[in-house]
Curated annotation (Swiss-Prot):
Keywords: Metal-binding, Oxidoreductase, Zinc. The gene is msrB. It comes from the Bacteria. One of its GO terms (cellular component) is cytoplasm. The lineage of its organism: Bacteria, Pseudomonadati, Pseudomonadota, Betaproteobacteria, Nitrosomonadales. Zn(2+) binds at C48, C51, C97, C100. It holds the Pfam family SelR. Residues 9-131 form the MsrB domain. This is Peptide methionine sulfoxide reductase MsrB. The active site is at C120 (nucleophile).
Length: 132
């Protein structure tokens, strides 16, 4: 299978943990203050846990006080795709991996400068790669 072909549901289930599958493929959310990266401070790059695409730099990570990893910008303009999410009786902006369309979390307009954005991301959606 080429990397351009979408994976089947069975392939995603085989590759991801049950928690990762629930969040990445079923648009779930992990409980606040429980994820591996909410209080993580190492230098490096956060990538999509499903496909490995680079998403965020640790230099853009900040403590939002919410209990989820928060970033004020994506690694680049192509890394994260956004779409309107109207679930749970709210209108929010969903953040998805541009490469594999996996659910990452949501984007809110209450972040710090320079962008004023807060990418509120599930730890289960991420893998961390330390800076060499």
């Amino acid at each position: 299978m080429s990397t351009d072909e979408p994976k089947t549901d069975a392939q995603w289930r085989a590759e991801l943990s049950p928690e990762q599958y629930r969040i990445l493929r079923e648009q779930g959310t992990e409980r606040a203050f429980t994820g591996e990266y909410w209080d993580h401070h190492a230098n490096g790059e956060y990538r999509c846990a499903a496909c490995g695409a680079p998403l965020f730099s640790s230099s853009a990570k900040f403590d939002s006080g919410t209990g989820w990893p928060s970033f004020y910008e994506a690694l680049n303009a192509q890394a994260v795709r956004e779409r309107t999410d109207t679930t749970h009786g709210m209108v929010r902006t969903e953040a998805l991996c541009s490469r594999c369309n996996s659910h990452l979390g949501h984007v809110f307009p209450d972040g710090p400068p320079p962008t004023g954005l807060r990418y509120c991301i599930n730890s289960a959606s991420l893998s961390f790669h330390p800076k060499d």
